[in-house]
């Protein structure tokens, strides 16, 4: 059926029809109800093609063509189908009609998404604007292995109802393709400020940087935490030494009534690049009481090895405080080291930490001291390893680790000999003292206790001080 569409509002049912405009052919009624389902009014102004019929509709060429004037609802165009606006396909007598486009008349316009309101040729009513609805996509995703990936449309704003719904109203664990998933970029949690071992005296954070050209050692004192004060309140300060020189030191400001002080102070030591690797940085943490007396809480020893000074950036380091031994040194000095045995790998580990109170032979020139670690079996030499030499200090610090291959069946007859040796001028050397640890066959006292504790705590480092004795090397 033909439908007459008019942009002008339709008159009320009770009002008379408006008079025909000049030039309007009889039998035409352009009035249409404003509702999409209003019926068309038949025209009675003149003769038509038949009784009770009117004229309406437009052809694709812009000509007015007759159409039956009946009361009907305007059909809606289905998605993907074009609505027919042309002349009726049959004549009033039922015979099919054939239409020819006049020469010079414009060709039918191609369908577009939007048309403008314009007057049609031959005095017809203006065309009604319309918009073609967009086609709906059936899915928002395309499998990666599918060949449709290149031709698939991309929607920058996907419908929210197609995404997983969570109780909080967000996207939950869903992540769009191309977006960054923050779960993949989580850094491991820093537990240095939360995990403190049993019996910890406190922890100190500092930074070390060495300027090669200016020969300056830059030390940054950052903070301390979990300090164990002898009283209810703690007022800490830190003294910095550059061993072996213990006469000169630098001191931080005192922080009042806190066990977790924040220092953020910087210190400079002038030291030659030739001797920097032989120096040891010492931090002594004190508590200042009401009488302004200094009570030692603990200390940190940090050897300035080559690997710690590589690079242009400043290294931030933390160390646990250690209690300073209050026992007077033995006659020939003392040596501190750790023992550990891994029964699964059959590996015996020795960590040489430091020595104190050494009796150096300072008769000639500059001297240096190192420690020689020897593995013995049935008092026979098996293997030997040496630490680096520390220049002219009676309290050298090493912090060096050595490992030996030893089966569990050999531990009953094996022993370790640690000898402190002083280098003299030329190729001469002098033994300053020696410690032997092992089973009951070779040792007694603290040396035997250290060995037995190592066997009872596999894969753990057991640390102890031992007095040096002056004996000949086997």
Swiss-Prot record:
GO terms for cellular component: exocytic vesicle; plasma membrane. Belongs to the synaptotagmin family. CDD domains: C2A_Synaptotagmin-15-17, C2B_Synaptotagmin-15. Keywords: Repeat. This is Synaptotagmin-15B. It comes from Homo sapiens (Human). Residues 75-88 have a biased composition (Low complexity). Residues 200-317, 331-452 form the C2 domain.
